[in-house]
Amino acid sequence: MAVSKVYARSVYDSRGNPTVEVELTTEKGVFRSIVPSGASTGIHEALEMRDGDKSKWLGKGVENAVKNVNDVIAPAFVKANVDIKDQKAVDDLLLSLDGTANKSKLGANAILGVSMAAARAAAAEKNVPLYQHLADLSDSKTSPFVLPVPFLNVLNGGSHAGGALALQEFMIAPTGAKSFREAMRIGSEVYHNLKSLTKKRYGSSAGNVGDEGGVAPDIQTAEEALDLIVDAIKAAGHEGKVKIGLDCASSEFFKDGKYDLDFKNPNSDASKWLSGPQLADLYHSLVKKYPIVSIEDPFAEDDWEAWSHFFKTAGVQIVADDLTVTNPKRIATAIEKKAADALLLKVNQIGSLSESIKAAQDSFAAGWGVMVSHRSGETEDTFIADLVVGLRTGQIKTGAPARSERLAKLNQLLRIEEELGDKAVYAGDNFHHGFKL
């Protein structure tokens, strides 16, 4: 079915920053996608094009990316008459129009918007849900479909919050639930208990939420944060059913080959900065003491030695985000160096759907897990909810059970679970190997 029109406009993300929305029109209707953006972005990511004109949107405008869709991609796309059901052909066309390794000519935000909108249009042309079309594209098994464990970011530190806490995300994972719906109820109850405990211990303003919906109290150490979460799990009556995941985002506090856990203090004491092995010892002690099942970005994005050293003895899922940035070359290196055993999949890091699917397939082939992820600057777009089901990864992180741009994805997963009924299973404790269920 022919695409009659491709059109982009600038809209706003959850931080109030401009982002790209793309509409693709076929006989079946108008199909829309909005591109997210990150705060802690890896240096090896595809280029998100921003205008840089400080007099408008403080330099964060996306008028050039929008113009690239409307003036370069749209005419070429309509003229090429590409079969939108063939995602590889769609993305190959987009990549050939750009011609750079990191999508810096047109912008990954321009390319991805079109790539996702095309997948939505193709699903409609086939008269199937988006998750089914994505399963077809990735040759995923669909009996049963797998609903993911939601890793809910309930407490924020690092670059996402004030306070001295260095680690960026503390997530709860309701692995003991029997269904996604029950996982959400458990997550919601723990979240509300955490909020009231936080206000009690740190004052009412501590209940205010960060970019991803988690509380951001003035906490100094990881232990203090974890004690608070464990207490909230107990108070909610869900002990044993809820595990914990960390996203350390440690590239953010890596300085001169060391890790500065007091990085938000401009006068931090350099004699207290930690070496890779010292930081690994800290993680080991946390894993011993708390029900942690997953640690993301424990070390900086090019500190390969620290990653490989820690992975040997970690005993929990080690997730690569800044290390791999959903980039097939970086993923291959991480697999070869035995640096991690799970990929954080962010579609806008690589900038097209086909490349995202390939990244997941490469990871599965190496026996890795895959956690599909939102970005901190999100929108009401729910694409990744269908993606996590289509790829059967068994795990997703898309913020707290609060703020509509986070809940949009979680609510879409509730709908998908309901629609699939007994054709789907909840990953639960098998989140790391969801694709094998």
From Swiss-Prot:
Pathway(s) of this molecule: Carbohydrate degradation; glycolysis; pyruvate from D-glyceraldehyde 3-phosphate: step 4/5
Catalytic residues in the record: E212 (proton donor), K346 (proton acceptor)
Sequence positions that bind substrate: H160, E169, E296, D321, S373, H374, R375, S376, K397
Gene3D superfamilies: Enolase-like C-terminal domain, Enolase-like, N-terminal domain
GO cellular component, one term: fungal-type vacuole
Protein name from the UniProt record: Enolase 2
Family the entry assigns: Belongs to the enolase family.
Residues annotated to bind Mg(2+): D247, E296, D321
Catalytic activity: (2R)-2-phosphoglycerate = phosphoenolpyruvate + H2O
Keyword terms of this UniProt record: Cytoplasm, Glycolysis, Lyase, Magnesium, Metal-binding
Organism, scientific name: Candida glabrata (strain ATCC 2001 / BCRC 20586 / JCM 3761 / NBRC 0622 / NRRL Y-65 / CBS 138)
PROSITE patterns: ENOLASE
Compartments in which it is found: Cytoplasm
TM helices/strands, residue ranges: none
